[in-house]
Curated annotation (Swiss-Prot):
Cell location: Cytoplasm
Organism the protein comes from: Lactococcus lactis subsp. cremoris (strain MG1363)
Family matches, as CDD domains: DEXHc_UvrB, SF2_C_UvrB
Residue ranges of every copy of the Helicase ATP-binding domain listed in the record: 32-187
Molecular-function annotations in GO: ATP binding; ATP hydrolysis activity; DNA binding; excinuclease ABC activity; helicase activity
Record's protein name: UvrABC system protein B
Pfam families, sorted: Helicase_C, ResIII, UVR, UvrB, UvrB_inter
Name of the gene encoding the protein in the UniProt record: uvrB
Its job: The UvrABC repair system catalyzes the recognition and processing of DNA lesions. A damage recognition complex composed of 2 UvrA and 2 UvrB subunits scans DNA for abnormalities. Upon binding of the UvrA(2)B(2) complex to a putative damaged site, the DNA wraps around one UvrB monomer. DNA wrap is dependent on ATP binding by UvrB and probably causes local melting of the DNA helix, facilitating insertion of UvrB beta-hairpin between the DNA strands. Then UvrB probes one DNA strand for the presence of a lesion.
Self-association state and partner proteins as the record states: Forms a heterotetramer with UvrA during the search for lesions. Interacts with UvrC in an incision complex.
């Protein structure tokens, strides 16, 4: 039975802050553009300017159901936590891949190796996915924070909605009919272990535990063949929380198919099997034909008997009634037509959207060519980028450095440059590559005397190693951050840098998560004129931003300055006319297009920030950020106060008990989607284990 979506709920933003800096202007521009029907726009916001708050204000003021996409689970979890705080009275949902572990089905012809699909589903995330889809069909005030997994097939929203079991007090329906209806939407009867997606029966009382809940269930009480009343109960204690006048029970799976559709689907699968067997046999692929026939007939038998089979998603084209090549249903189809999409870190996320389809296709083609799957399995896939675009009603790309794709989609760019702390983008200068190491040594000594830190980025592993060795010979306290270093070690290195155990961190890629250090006042980029992934415009801007947390922030780009530009040389004059040059000691030298654009953009932002600070009497202050010792572990005393525990003073048995306790807390934090807290607890556990 279909249900009506409640459309009169409003978003209610709860925050103790008012828009600061240029947030107010950015918010009003974005809202005005949306209300004027602008399809795509970019929020180009510098790091640390409060882009999530701006996004929240835009959602609240436009009132549109919104999909917020991020490029990984960790970032999605952080955004989800922030939006939950901003909108405690609205439906803020979380939709990411529910696999803790996932090994996709694959075949490697070179070694004749078939790898069966193997996975482990996270029950908590599965619950949140069900909560997201049910909220989207029930109400309008919904924000769904999702990873790119939201463009993967999910089942038909119409079948899902039409399968809803709708109950009201006074409704005429027999108890047995309700039980049949619940089984029909994939609920299981379990009178002993009552959990999500189950129901239990006690005389004239049926208790239902929805797939989207984790603590509360519903008790349906019958009087003959009529529902007497419906109560919400706490699962653990059985305590009645209140009565409800309507209960919509959504299916326990997103992949719903009624009996008639199932028979149609099986007939189509059989027809496709017959056609594909003819193709294989005509090509002399008898092994492939036998394999396909055996596997598919087994799946058909399972579908007939159980309504389900292993890898049922590979038959989704037939189950959904789609034509060959048609896009699958995804989370996007559950939204109303006028919904809004916000893409966080769009320069990363849109690249993922583009790449998902091709990677999936290559793996599935191998399975189909060798008789492991029917060709229709190719239509169990993520959306292509063009198909994703066809779902877009209105979209906001959010990034400090928008990608080429976003820039091609729209000319409407809204900027957010002012940081509430008053911090400026750093001063950037270019210096010659000749003598760069000695020059850098001098700069490092200046920073060390002021108790400040330095980042040095190189292009190759060998150069990083050689540079680190040279600095050590010169008496500089230095460490090298390379790709083999694990997360925990990286955290330790950053902590030691902040504490002043060493002054200089050398690395190739210093753009990873968690490497924002307020004590860093100098970033030196060696070989800045060598175009590539970390020396393109976006890479340079992001690396330059590492010095933007310190009021003394300074960046030096070391570049080849072997030959000054000569205005009388036609080739040099062309470079001078293009503007891709810099001045050093009265002479002009060629620089790359990326360097020029990164420097110009940083200078432009800095000028705007300085003017704002001057007008409002703001003095930039370096961010004060607590330095947490990994070994410092706190526990609650009997009085409820926190006290620090010295792990090194514990014996082995005490540490083992503490590890057990922390692991439990880590799992609780992960279940509550506090991924940062869970990661900190994990690091503590690893540290404690390393001590024994």
């Amino acid at each position: 039975m279909a249900i009506e979506r409640i459309t009169d709920n409003k978003f209610e933003l709860v925050s103790k802050y008012d828009p600061a800096g240029d947030q107010g202007q950015a918010i009003s521009e974005l809202v005005e553009n949306i209300e004027n029907g602008e399809k795509a726009q970019i929020l180009r916001g510098a790091t640390g300017t409060g882009k999530t708050y701006t996004m929240s204000q835009v959602i609240a003021q436009t009132g549109k159901p919104t999909l917020v996409m991020a490029h990984n689970k960790t970032l999605a979890g952080q955004l989800y936590s922030e939006f939950k705080e901003f909108f405690p009275n609205n439906a803020v949902e979380y939709f990411v891949s529910y696999y803790d572990y996932y090994q996709p089905e694959a075949y490697v012809p070179s070694s004749d190796t078939y790898i069966e699909k193997d996975s482990s589903v996270n029950d908590e995330i599965d619950k949140l996915r069900h909560s997201a889809t049910s909220s989207l069909l029930e109400r309008n005030d919904v924000i769904v924070v999702a990873s790119v997994s939201c463009i993967y097939g999910l089942g038909s929203p119409k079948e899902y909605q039409d399968s809803v079991v709708s109950l009201r007090p006074g409704q005429e329906i027999s108890r047995d009919q309700l039980l049949n209806d619940l089984v029909g939407i994939q609920f299981e009867r379990n009178d002993i272990d009552f959990q999500r997606g189950c129901f239990r029966v006690r005389g004239d009382v049926v208790e239902v535990f929805p797939a989207s809940r984790d603590e509360h269930a519903f008790r349906v009480e019958f009087f003959g063949d009529e529902i007497d009343r419906i109560r919400e109960i706490e699962v653990l204690t059985g305590q009645v929380l209140g009565e409800v006048d309507h209960l919509a029970i959504f299916p326990a799976t997103h992949f719903m198919t009624n009996d008639d559709r199932m028979e149609e689907s099986i007939a189509k699968i059989e027809a496709e099997l017959e056609a594909q067997l003819k193709v294989f046999r005509s090509e002399g692929k008898l092994l492939e034909a036998q394999r396909l026939e055996q596997r598919t007939n087994y799946d058909i038998e399972m579908l007939r008997e159980m309504g389900y089979c292993n890898g049922v998603e590979n038959y989704s084209r037939h189950m959904d009634g789609r034509e060959e090549g048609e896009p699958p249903y995804t989370l996007l189809d559950f939204f109303p037509d006028d919904f809004m999409i916000m893409i966080d870190e769009s320069h990363m996320t849109m690249g993922q959207v583009k790449g998902m389809y091709n990677g999936d296709r290559a793996r599935k083609e191998m399975l189909c060519n060798y008789g492991f799957r029917l060709p229709s399995a190719l239509d169990n896939r993520p959306l292509k980028r063009e198909e994703f675009e066809s779902h877009v009603h209105q979209i906001v790309y959010v990034s400090a450095t928008p990608g080429d794709y976003e820039m091609e989609q729209t000319d409407t760019i809204v900027e957010q440059i002012i940081r509430p702390t008053g911090l400026l983008d750093p001063v950037v200068e270019v210096r010659p590559m000749m003598g760069q190491i000695d020059d850098l040594v001098g700069e490092i000594h200046k920073r060390a005397e002021k108790n400040e830190r330095v980042f040095v980025t190189t292009l190759t592993k060998k150069m990083s190693e050689d540079l680190t060795a040279y600095f050590k010979e010169m008496g500089i306290k230095v460490k090298y951050m390379h790709s083999d270093i694990k997360t925990l070690e990286r955290t330790e290195i950053i902590r030691d840098l902040r504490l002043g155990v060493f002054d200089v961190l050398v690395g190739i890629n210093l753009l990873r998560e968690g490497i924002d250090v307020p004590e860093v006042s100098l970033v030196a980029i060696l070989d800045a004129d060598k175009e590539g992934f970390l020396r393109n415009e976006r890479g340079l801007i992001q690396t330059i931003g590492r010095a933007a947390r310190n009021s003394e922030g300074h960046v030096i780009l070391y570049s080849d300055m072997a030959k000054a530009l000569d205005e009388n040389d036609p080739a040099d004059k062309e470079i001078l006319d293009s503007g891709y040059y810099t001045e050093y000691e009265g002479k002009k030298y060629k620089i790359t297009r990326s360097m020029k654009h990164a420097m110009d953009e940083t200078a432009r932002r800095r000028d705007i920030q300085m003017a704002y600070n001057e007008e409002h009497g703001i003095t930039p202050q370096t961010i004060k950020k607590e330095i947490r010792d990994l070994i410092a572990i706190t526990k609650k005393t009997d009085s409820g106060e926190l006290e620090e525990v010295d792990a090194s003073a514990m014996n082995k048995k005490e540490r083992k008990a503490l590890v057990k306790k922390l692991e439990k807390e880590m799992q609780q934090a992960a279940a509550a989607l506090d991924f940062e807290g869970a990661a900190q607890l994990r690091d503590m556990v690893l540290e404690l284990r390393a001590m024994d």
